Amino acid sequence: MIRMKKKQWIFVLVLVLVLTMLFYRYGLPFIHRNKYAKVKTQYEFTEIINLGCTSVKQQGASNTCWSYTGNSFLESEMIRMGKKPVEISQIYTARQAYLGRAQNFVRLHGGLSMGEGGQLHDVLNVFRKYGALPQSAYSGLYGNNTYNDFKKMTPMLNSLLKVLVKTKPLRSNWEESYQAALDAHLGKVPETFDYEGKKYTARTFADQVIGIKPDDYVALASVTDQPFYEPFVLLVPDNWSFDSFYNVPMEQLTNIIDTALQRGFTVAWTTDVSENGFSWQHGLAYVPQKSEDEMSKEELKTMFVKPMPERKITAAERQAAFENWQTTDDHAMHIVGLANDQYGRPYYIVKNSWGKANPYKGYMYVTKEFVRFKTISLLLHKDALEAKIKTKVTL
């Protein structure tokens, strides 16, 4: 019998503990996320509309889906306008938005939530105020970083601001300190850069190369406690700029998207992806007829295997979910097309920013019922709207 020395036993024990911790930290979530992975899907999709868009990106460990989605949307607008698309720096947009959010935090004496999230209009607001950079000029990957990782940056920035607002009088140079902290994590923003043999600033690149006009776009949302077709401030944590949205009835959300797609316009979309009917691993989102508690083991096992019946959502149910925080503004994606399953049921083709590690290489198929239930907001070109909608919202 082989006898182990005390040091060897300690090493083995530590190794077992480490492996156990790694399993619980990474193994169990992976198993949970992939509990249906061995069941072959029976979905068959036929594309009806698939509009031009750039490649799927990976936002990494950063809550910048709004910037990835908003800039993907602008890249598709370049394609629609007959321009050669360029990958717009998502982190430049996010960085400038973080500065604006910090300014509002300070103006409100700390009375504003801070975080990495944002709304789609932030992309347009940054474009309007600062311009834009290509990814080749500013990746936001500093030092040896190969992907976005804000886990250290965000707490540090928030701590800086919390200390700042407790200081009286307010330091006049606080923005310099904030910018220096951003530089330390993301790298300095170049004042000028070369792109395809020509020198640009962020302003001239936005105007001359990308060429969109921020005022040509409209943001829409749907609530029942505000007048329809009137602008209102959507009170969600990531609307830190307190921008307004035009309010439309729930039933109009999918009609508006359908019209836009038919006219050749893509749509940027913010939504809630915390529901059990959303599965990134399967590339699907729908509204199950039953809750998970009501499902049998077999029904749970086949939730994303074949097209399932959906529960019809009412405007009252949608509003209740928004008010009780069942629906939250936790993600943004880019609607680029329309498809039917083998039974003729329509799905939107949606581009995500979580890389390509799902069955549809980074895209998802989302039912109209899910969109009606879980939409927070839409952003699209004004010309994508029907005349009667444009008239009602006085565009």
Functional labels for PLM-detected ranges:
Residues 1-4, 34, 166-172:
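Generic structural signal for short, solvent-exposed loop/turn connectors between secondary structure elements
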Residues 20-34:
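Membrane-interface motif at the C-terminal end of an N-terminal transmembrane signal
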Residues 26-27, 176-395:
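Active-site signature of cysteine proteases
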Residues 32-42:
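Acidic, low-complexity proline/glycine-rich segments
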Residues 2-17:
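N-terminal Sec-pathway targeting helices
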